[in-house]
Amino acid sequence: MGLIRVLANLLILQLSYAQKSSELVIGGDECNINEHRFLAIVHTDISLCTGTLINQEWVLTAAHCDGGNMDIYLGVHNESVRYDDEEGRVPAEKFFCLSSRNFTKWDKDIMLIRLNIPVRNSAHIAPLSLPSSPPSVGSVCRVMGWGTITSPNETYPDVPHCANINLFDYEVCLAAYPEFGLPATSKTLCAGILEGGKDTCVGDAGGPLICNGQFQGILSWGDDPCAQPRLPAVYTKVFDHLDWIQSIIAGNTDATCPFVNF
């Protein structure tokens, strides 16, 4: 078993820029240009991640995607073709569940970013709403990004790819990764394809898991090589963090994250 992808993501900037390092999905197809208007590229000194625009001023991503000199790009479909409505932003503020930015307890890998300037809805930019209810085990979920489409050797395309995967009971991930000592209960989601072949991968961290049209998860980590049988990925559960997200957006910067008894 290789290093988990949360670590591999931090090494992605060492790749040649000739490879077009960004975000993508193993076993997927090119996304429809109209289905990812909320998708953000999150670029820092140490990593390339993705994020999700949840209103004109706020982006959700993974805490481990934090780094210096962060740039956020919205409205991108083809990295070699610039659209008139593409937007670049930097963070005005970043908020974390833990003041120490410690995501090693797995349930706290979430970061809320306030953009320095709000974006406007356009042909290629529009937010994705927060979920109104939790997801159901067995749901078919959509993942997307510009990350590597091959693993362990990495190949980066110019356009985002999308794939459908399944939402499992959390116990499936407990059984898949016994060596990590995962907590018995968790505010994360477990998703993938048990027979392998489709998966998120290096560079997709922080990206959305969309189940039945609702934004339910933020990619946290998975196995490397990607898309192996019976080794699904782990996603921060957005629904369980709604109170924290909405409180921060409303101006309560002292809001605390939900507690899990480990």
From Swiss-Prot:
Residues linked to a glycan: 78, 102, 153
Disulfide bonds: 31-162, 49-65, 97-257, 141-211, 173-190, 201-226
Domain Peptidase S1: 25-250
A single BP term in Gene Ontology: proteolysis
UniProt entry keywords in alphabetical sequence: Disulfide bond, Glycoprotein, Secreted, Serine protease homolog, Signal, Toxin
Compartments (UniProt record): Secreted
Propeptide section residues: 19-24
Gene Ontology cellular component terms for the protein in this record: extracellular region; secretory granule
One annotated GO molecular function: toxin activity
InterPro entries: Peptidase_S1_PA, Peptidase_S1_PA_chymotrypsin, Peptidase_S1A, Trypsin_dom, TRYPSIN_HIS
Tissue: Expressed by the venom gland.
Secretion signal span: 1-18
Main location: secreted
Subunit note: Monomer.
Membership in a protein family: Belongs to the peptidase S1 family. Snake venom subfamily.
Protein name: Inactive snake venom serine proteinase 13
Species annotation: Crotalus adamanteus
Lineage: Eukaryota, Metazoa, Chordata, Craniata, Vertebrata
